[in-house]
Amino acid sequence: MRQQLATAARHAWAVSPLGQGIESYDGLPAEILYDEPHRQLRRYCPETRVPAGRPVLLVPPLAVSTRCYDLRPGQSLAAHLVGSGRATYVIDYGAITFADREMGFEDWIDDILATAIMTANAASGGHGVDVVGWSLGGTMSLLTAASHPRLPIASLTAFGTPFDYTLIPAVQPLLTIDRLLGTRRAMTLTGAMGGVPRHLVRASYRAMAPRRELTKALHLARNILDVEALARTEAIDDFIGSMPGYPGRAYHQLHSRLMARNELAEGTVRLTQDREVRLRDITTRVLLVGSATDNIANGPAVEAGTQVIPGARYVAADGLSHLGLVAGPKAPMLSWPSLDVFLGQ
């Protein structure tokens, strides 16, 4: 009993704001292929095996760090892919500030992702790249593939990428405000701030999982002797704490085009008056993975993509949360196997 009390006290101090944390994880080693503002491309270093097969490019969402793919030991999709013998790349957007307020979807579609795909392809033998995106990272990847069908994209997998925003309960308050005020007025505050600052992004992400936030203290108390449970909670908190902000133009496009007008569900996104991106122009194989228990992009909202992308296939990984689709402790059993099969085809 005395030893348990000592362990509990040590763990309680470690998870407190003054503590050093339960688990120290610096991430997988990686080499930088190029490093420019909002576009750093890294290749994870294999431990022993020589990479074989097509390379994989991991695309994070806007306003999310690359930690989503390398959360911690056992919850790292990047480590899983590297361990399977694939050359694995990740594109990092870095910090987003007020100075970046003019960055829009076009910057990702025409430059950031297109350049990353071509570079990864050239660095790995030129046989095509398997692109994997999570959440809005999947959206940007799909819009890139539709806009540039000649890019060397061998396949595209999107985890938790919503298409029909009318099916997502968490988005409905924003849509109600938009209907009452109109898009221009609804966007006044974010326009003045040059986007969505990182602190607001982090608070919004936490608000979309209220049960987790309300019960976190009780969860920590109940598991104060369980190092693994504490480390998982700590990793998620660190991940949320690393979220950058949304640039103004990109958030305006997200709000007005994807949410308010629900254009992805229609299959055509109108970036400007002169430019439309049609999902039917995607020529590569597409896999959509979703979960009925995802509070941010539930299964039906993700599966709606099969109605607008030619040949797209949907796979359910029910029981996983939004982040859990790519980095949950059950992802190796529920969602990663579908990716492995798809990449092997």
Where are these regions (language model features)?
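Alpha/beta-hydrolase-fold enzymes
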Residues: A122, G126, S141-R249
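Short beta-strand immediately N-terminal to the catalytic nucleophile in serine-hydrolase-like folds
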Residues: V131-G133, F159, V289
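Short beta-strand/loop motif that positions the catalytic acidic residue
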Residues: I282, L288-G290, D294
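Conserved loop-alpha-helix segment in the C-terminal half of the alpha/beta-hydrolase fold
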Residues: A292-R313
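Catalytic histidine-centered segment of alpha/beta-hydrolase-like enzymes
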Residues: I296-G299, Y314, L320-L334
